[in-house]
Amino acid sequence: MLIWSPKGRAAAGVVASVLFIVFFFLPLAVILMSSLSQQWNGILPSGFTLNHFVNALHGAAWDALLASLTIGFCASLFALLCGVWAALALRQYGVKTQKWLSMVFYLPSAIPSVSVGLGILVAFSQGPLQMNGTLWIVLTAHFVLISAFTFSNVSTGLARISADIENVASSLGASPWYRLRHVTLPLLMPWMVSALALSLSLSMGELGATVMIYPPGWTTLPVAIFSLTDRGNIADGAALTIVLVAITLLLMMKLERIAKRLGQK
């Protein structure tokens, strides 16, 4: 095959590098330069300043950061709890039954987030479960959107745990609850932490559904960035974008490091 030849590997490396630079590095570099610019009327900024980052860490922008972290952690932890429960429950069924029941969790990931937001807005704007104008409606939307990815990660980890380990514990007289607490969950913990990292990053960057349903006082960072750029305040929006990217990456790196450490035990 071409990819196994030295020229093929070199060509693949060049293509991958070009795609990375064009579609990831350059846009991020432009956003960073914009966040530091005093004025940008030509090819390059005419001056640099940190005032946009100062604005991003004060007032409404700071509140948006706290709101994003609160919503992200709450929705991700609840999605993790439900994902673990669902993965453990589905393991009792056959392969075909697992496949069809898993689609219940995977379905929201196939629906545009705007459609999810609209559906939740209509469903919970009246009646006994009215949540419109509250934090709960945002948490519900984020949970629906990230639950599929959490369930997928946990299911993958659970599939890699040998059934023989639990069978040995059972043969030694361990109860189902003891096996779950002292055997299954400790072995599953690295995938649970990885699932938490993925769902948290997805929640932190969610815009489509949130912009339709967020209540006053719970503006998230993506919504704040959208509002700033929509008003033409590109530099402050760029600074807030860099803050969002940096915090999300730091959280993911920390959680993945924890997951790796747990996997080595």
UniProtKB/Swiss-Prot annotation:
Keyword Transmembrane: yes
Entries under InterPro entries matching the protein: AminoethylPonate_ABC_PhnV, MetI-like, MetI-like_sf
Cellular localisation: Cell inner membrane
Pfam families named in the record: BPD_transp_1
Ranges where the ABC transmembrane type-1 domain occurs: 65-253
GO CC term (a single one): plasma membrane
GO biological processes: transmembrane transport
UniProt key word Translocase: no
Membrane topology, record value: Multi-pass membrane protein
UniProt keywords, alphabetically: Cell inner membrane, Cell membrane, Membrane, Transmembrane, Transmembrane helix, Transport
Segments traversing the membrane: 13-33, 69-89, 104-124, 131-151, 185-205, 233-253
Family: Belongs to the binding-protein-dependent transport system permease family.
Role summary: Probably part of the PhnSTUV complex (TC 3.A.1.11.5) involved in 2-aminoethylphosphonate import. Probably responsible for the translocation of the substrate across the membrane.
PANTHER family in UniProt: INNER MEMBRANE ABC TRANSPORTER PERMEASE PROTEIN YDCV (PTHR43357:SF4)
Name of the protein this chain belongs to: Putative 2-aminoethylphosphonate transport system permease protein PhnV
Chain's gene name: phnV
